[in-house]
Amino acid sequence: MPGLLLLTTTMLLILFALIICFYIKTKTFKMQLQFLSEQNLEINNNNQLLNQEKITYLQKIEQLKCKLEYQERMIKDSEKIREESFASAKAALFDLGKDLSKQLIEIHKMENNTTRELAEKNIETASQKFNTELERLITMVGALNKDIEQSKGTVDLIKQSLLSPIGAGLLSEITLENILKSSGLRPNLDFIMQYSLTTSDSVKLRPDAIIFLPSGNLMVIDSKASKFLVDSQDNSVHLSKTMNYHLKTLTNKDYAENILTNLNKKTQNFNNVITLMFLPTEQAVEKVIAANPEFLQKAWGCNIFPVGPAGLMNMLSFAKFQITDNRRSENYKVIIEEVRKLLSSIGTIADYSKKIGYNLQNMVTNYDKFAASFNRNVMSRVKSIQKLGIDSGNKIIPATLERYQIVSAKSEIIEVDVENQHK
């Protein structure tokens, strides 16, 4: 009995194993059959699509063939129509030429008479217009003479105004103000017009312009003018006396001392003063030198420099350069301070980035350890289960989890030779 039971058990196990093998093979054959059926169905569908495309292309070929035949017929018909129309147009032009020749001969005869009549009328009309324009020109010339007389009076009035001391002074001040405005200097910051001050002797002074230069320097401009500078007549003696008087009054005013005293009271420290005597035109400077060749030397000896518009523009250009350079130096200090703040901010950001780098390194290290443990302990069991015939369905299970490592490297700092770079 025990031997029979063992034999029966063995037979059942063998039978069960055969059934499992048969089941697995049947399952495999079914899957292969299903796969082949799907491929066969896909091939049939592709064949149907290809047949449909073939039919479509054949239809298009037939349509294109019909269109080509139709176009060939149209070309032949158009050539026939063009030949017929050319022949008919040629005949029509021939007939039209005959008619036009006859009409032109008749029109030429009529035009001869009409032209003669029109010429007579045009000559009469032109004569009337000429007489009318001549009368109008005579009237305009009379009115122009009146305007010239009025303009002459206005010019004389302007000349008299300029020849007066007040008019000449205003002209010089206006010229000075226009030059200062066009020089690029900033009003009320780089220069002040008509600066009024009172001396210790209660004497009021008003230089026409004061320009603030860097390093405690001032440029004082006082415009001087005379009617003899504008007058076209030769008045060298009077001009010399007038300009010497202007120089004397300008020296007696002692702008340098009084302006320094006045401005230093306003918590502004100025050390040096340059005084300019401004003349309204370069011709005025030449007249002064011609009237008194020693005038410039005398003025320079008093630390006063006579200049015209060109000389003033040169000095203002130099002054603008100094002011701009000083402003750039002041801004340079501000830039240095801002760069210092920027470097401090960069240091703070570097500390934070260093901490972030450490955190990233720890995260990647921990992930790598997790992936190694997962691949070793979990994925090996998953593979064993899949070998037993249990699939994951539509989900694809990766063979292993990818592992990552962070490589720490120090960046090389490129040092730049500042001196060679500036060279």
UniProtKB/Swiss-Prot annotation:
InterPro entries: DNA_recombination_RmuC. Pfam families: RmuC (PF02646). Residues 30-81 form a coiled coil. Keywords: Coiled coil, DNA recombination. It comes from the Bacteria. GO terms for biological process: DNA recombination. Belongs to the RmuC family. Involved in DNA recombination. This is DNA recombination protein RmuC homolog. The gene is rmuC.
